[in-house]
Amino acid sequence: MSDTGSSGATARAQSDDRTLAFVVYAMHFVAPFVFGLTALIGVAIAYVRRPAAEPVLASHYRFQIRVFWVGFGLSIVAALAVMFGMGMIVWELAGAFLSDLPTDPTEAVTRNLDVDLPVAAFVSLIIASCAWIATALWMIVASVAGALRLSAGRGIRMKAERP
């Protein structure tokens, strides 16, 4: 009788682990819309649950961790590109405004700033936009694909694991 109770507890634990893996996929899916906060919680869950999970679920937790780190890397690229582009624009505007300051207050109000903004600033902002879009698509598509494989009871084989 203890075997039946033990196998029931094991089945329940596997079911809970499977449900938790679905929850992590949902957190990854929502992450682009909430600035990645749910992905951070999801990857923490995946790191904690992976060692004790059965092989199929462990493969999903490994995949969820990889999805997080790829998304995080793309987000860093986007953030750096935004900082570079905005920094160049602010630098150019500050330089144009602060050079040759007028002494008459009325002249300061009517002054026309003729600024040539650097093309590199706009290119970096375009790169940032592309990186944000790539991050969102990666998080959404990878989480949907993983959830579909999990619902079918199939594991995820990553390139490093293939023979």
Q: Where do the PLM segments sit?
A:
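Membrane-interfacial helical/loop segments at transmembrane boundaries in membrane proteins
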Residues: 93-117
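Membrane-interface elements of multi-pass transporters and channels
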Residues: 48-52, 84-100, 150-154
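Intrinsically disordered, low-complexity regulatory segments
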Residues: 2-5, 11, 92-96, 122
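Hydrophobic alpha-helical transmembrane segments in multi-pass membrane proteins
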Residues: 19-40, 66-95, 120-143
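Membrane-interface extramembranous regions at the lipid-water interface
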Residues: 2-31, 44-68, 110-114, 143-163
